């Protein structure tokens, strides 16, 4: 078992990483929550696989549990879904002294966290991430949000969980496409902050070799994010480097209506494209983009998409949350493991 402490004064919490942790979720929940009712927000796929077993596991600790399930996919992270969830919580008579659990990938984590931050002006929640992307990235750091038609994560808040429970064995039920989704974010951590992690990923023989070491990889990624979040909770400084590849990535997701490319796949393409642009402008060490592209291809990730001459891309980039008063903070690399913030404008991409 590995435990990381995210130190944020009264908002501090633990990240617990352990194989087969799902058999002990109820016991861990009891260490941070002494209320009565627990509402689990999940999606239909995960509910079919884990819903009943996890519900019983938590009930065995004396809690009253209700499961609320949504349709899988990014389109559930919208305002149209919220009233139905709020009403189910009201029917369950959930109070501010009760608990919400986010059981799922990045979409469920963002959605359930946003619900927790807004229902009754905020109630406690716990993250139980089940996808690689959520385990290494989105479950840690307190960012919760829903999408608008004009872009991703445009309405949200910083709202930290009480606890993050990560069972790497739950990745065994994950379709390969969504494992790849998380690999995009894993590679990102190596790019921005850890040359050692990047070289470790280069050194694995293949994806199966990586999977055998996945607990260690999850820990390293969470530890990098923990450090960045502690130093810059509200994402106004160094934490921004976590958005490497995301400016173009979000634009790609939006252009393809969140259907063709998953978040991690789009970020992988964004990292590759931005590195090539930065090298051409002498803002990144020569050869860096080639190493990134090679590593992405090694793990079966897409590296390019044609968004040239597409006005939608420009509009999507304008809505990027790193676009402040017309100035766009783009995340670039000096070299592998050395991310930095570069202040520019949308014209950077033209």
UniProtKB/Swiss-Prot annotation:
<comment type="similarity">
    <text>Belongs to the sugar phosphate cyclases superfamily. Dehydroquinate synthase family.</text>
</comment>
<keyword id="KW-0479">Metal-binding</keyword>
<keyword id="KW-0547">Nucleotide-binding</keyword>
<dbReference type="InterPro" id="IPR030963">
    <property type="entry name" value="DHQ_synth_fam"/>
</dbReference>
<feature type="binding site">
    <location>
        <position position="143"/>
    </location>
    <ligand>
        <name>NAD(+)</name>
    </ligand>
</feature>
<dbReference type="InterPro" id="IPR016037">
    <property type="entry name" value="DHQ_synth_AroB"/>
</dbReference>
<protein>
    <recommendedName>
        <fullName>3-dehydroquinate synthase</fullName>
        <ecNumber>4.2.3.4</ecNumber>
    </recommendedName>
</protein>
<dbReference type="Pfam" id="PF24621">
    <property type="entry name" value="DHQS_C"/>
</dbReference>
<keyword id="KW-0963">Cytoplasm</keyword>
<keyword id="KW-0028">Amino-acid biosynthesis</keyword>
<dbReference type="GO" id="GO:0005737">
    <property type="term" value="C:cytoplasm"/>
</dbReference>
<feature type="binding site">
    <location>
        <position position="152"/>
    </location>
    <ligand>
        <name>NAD(+)</name>
    </ligand>
</feature>
<dbReference type="InterPro" id="IPR056179">
    <property type="entry name" value="DHQS_C"/>
</dbReference>
<dbReference type="GO" id="GO:0046872">
    <property type="term" value="F:metal ion binding"/>
</dbReference>
<dbReference type="InterPro" id="IPR030960">
    <property type="entry name" value="DHQS/DOIS_N"/>
</dbReference>
<keyword id="KW-0456">Lyase</keyword>
<keyword id="KW-0520">NAD</keyword>
<keyword id="KW-0057">Aromatic amino acid biosynthesis</keyword>
<comment type="function">
    <text>Catalyzes the conversion of 3-deoxy-D-arabino-heptulosonate 7-phosphate (DAHP) to dehydroquinate (DHQ).</text>
</comment>
<dbReference type="GO" id="GO:0008652">
    <property type="term" value="P:amino acid biosynthetic process"/>
</dbReference>
<feature type="binding site">
    <location>
        <begin position="130"/>
        <end position="131"/>
    </location>
    <ligand>
        <name>NAD(+)</name>
    </ligand>
</feature>
<keyword id="KW-0170">Cobalt</keyword>
<dbReference type="GO" id="GO:0000166">
    <property type="term" value="F:nucleotide binding"/>
</dbReference>
<dbReference type="InterPro" id="IPR050071">
    <property type="entry name" value="Dehydroquinate_synthase"/>
</dbReference>
<feature type="binding site">
    <location>
        <begin position="106"/>
        <end position="110"/>
    </location>
    <ligand>
        <name>NAD(+)</name>
    </ligand>
</feature>
<keyword id="KW-0862">Zinc</keyword>
<comment type="pathway">
    <text>Metabolic intermediate biosynthesis; chorismate biosynthesis; chorismate from D-erythrose 4-phosphate and phosphoenolpyruvate: step 2/7.</text>
</comment>
<dbReference type="GO" id="GO:0009073">
    <property type="term" value="P:aromatic amino acid family biosynthetic process"/>
</dbReference>
<feature type="binding site">
    <location>
        <position position="263"/>
    </location>
    <ligand>
        <name>Zn(2+)</name>
    </ligand>
</feature>
<feature type="binding site">
    <location>
        <position position="246"/>
    </location>
    <ligand>
        <name>Zn(2+)</name>
    </ligand>
</feature>
<dbReference type="GO" id="GO:0009423">
    <property type="term" value="P:chorismate biosynthetic process"/>
</dbReference>
<dbReference type="Pfam" id="PF01761">
    <property type="entry name" value="DHQ_synthase"/>
</dbReference>
<feature type="binding site">
    <location>
        <position position="185"/>
    </location>
    <ligand>
        <name>Zn(2+)</name>
    </ligand>
</feature>
<dbReference type="GO" id="GO:0003856">
    <property type="term" value="F:3-dehydroquinate synthase activity"/>
</dbReference>
